[in-house]
Amino acid sequence: MLTAQDKQKIIKENQLAESDTGSPEVQVALLTARINDLQGHFEAHKKDNHSRRGLLRLVSQRRKLLDYLHDKDVERYRSLIKKLNIRR
């Protein structure tokens, strides 16, 4: 589970401007943190299919944001996947 401090740290690291909280970079970074957190959960709870469906929803949402960013600005897209270490 991400704490408020964790979220603020992620936002601070990925924001484009001082008040930026909704750019695709910030949203993808937050989703990536939640996805990584859930992956740790599934190591202990292999049969938790209800949460697995939520994980797939988060992955799909992140994929859509990454596709949007790729179409809008390829350089920002490449730097983001490199920074977050997302395979693609």
Swiss-Prot record:
InterPro entries xref list: Ribosomal_uS15, Ribosomal_uS15_bac-type, uS15_NS1_RNA-bd_sf
Pfam hit, one = Ribosomal_S15
Tell me which GO cellular component terms the UniProt record holds: cytosolic small ribosomal subunit
Gene Ontology MF terms? rRNA binding; structural constituent of ribosome
Which one GO biological process term can you cite for this protein?
Answer: translation
Listed A to Z, the keywords are: Ribonucleoprotein, Ribosomal protein, RNA-binding, rRNA-binding
PANTHER family according to UniProt: RIBOSOMAL PROTEIN S15, BACTERIAL AND ORGANELLAR, SMALL RIBOSOMAL SUBUNIT PROTEIN US15M
Q: What does this protein do?
A: One of the primary rRNA binding proteins, it binds directly to 16S rRNA where it helps nucleate assembly of the platform of the 30S subunit by binding and bridging several RNA helices of the 16S rRNA. Forms an intersubunit bridge (bridge B4) with the 23S rRNA of the 50S subunit in the ribosome.
- Relate the assembly described in the record: Part of the 30S ribosomal subunit. Forms a bridge to the 50S subunit in the 70S ribosome, contacting the 23S rRNA.
Similarity remark: Belongs to the universal ribosomal protein uS15 family.
Question: Under what name is this protein listed?
Answer: Small ribosomal subunit protein uS15
